Each structure stands twice: as structure tokens, then as C-alpha cells.
Amino acid sequence: MAQGQRKFQAQKPAKSKAAAAAASARNRGPRKGGRVIAPKKARIVQQQQLKKNLEVGIRKKIEHDVVMKASTSLPKKLALLKASTKKKEASSSTKMPA
């Protein structure tokens, strides 16, 4: 039998933060929304890019129309919140050249 007190309590080795984050991401379960699998053929890549650009343009046009209609009907000026410049810079740097 051991004599005296232990100098320190035995502890498990600390896990890295990246490993802990990956483990928690795995344990979260399925996520909402569709999945996009990138195609291999260049023609299909261009078609998807065109489709995405059209969807973005249509959405922006609809948002602009709604804002204009709302601003004309309201007695007070409509103030809109713009996205921060950090997000715009990050999104522009991640775009792939066509």
C-alpha cells in the first residue's frame, strides 16, 4: 500500500480544440437544407454558374422592387441595413475565376 499523499491528481491528456470542434460537429446530426455536389464537366459547371447568377439577379430585383414599393407607401423614410464590408470582401475573394 502506498505511503503518503499523491503530489498531483492524475488527469487525462488535453484534446486539441480542432479535434474537439470536429467531434462536436460529427455529433450534431444531419443539417437542414440541400446539398450541392460540384459537377466534373466544365459545361455543367458553367450552366450551374449561369443559373446561380440568374437566381441572384432575380432575387436582387425582387428585393429592390419591394423596397421601392415600401418606401413610397411609408410616410417615414425607409432605412435599410447593409451587409458589412468584411463579408463582401470575403465573398469576392472566394469567387472562382471563370
UniProtKB/Swiss-Prot annotation:
Signal peptide: none
Annotated Low complexity bias: 16-25, 73-83
Sequence segments annotated as region (Disordered): 1-38, 73-98
Segments of skewed composition (Basic residues): 28-38
TM helices/strands, residue ranges: none
Superkingdom, taxonomy of origin: Eukaryota
Matching InterPro entries: UPF0390
Function, as annotated: May have a potential role in hypercalcemia of malignancy.
Family: Belongs to the UPF0390 family.
Protein name per UniProt: Leydig cell tumor 10 kDa protein homolog
Annotated organism of origin: Bos taurus (Bovine)
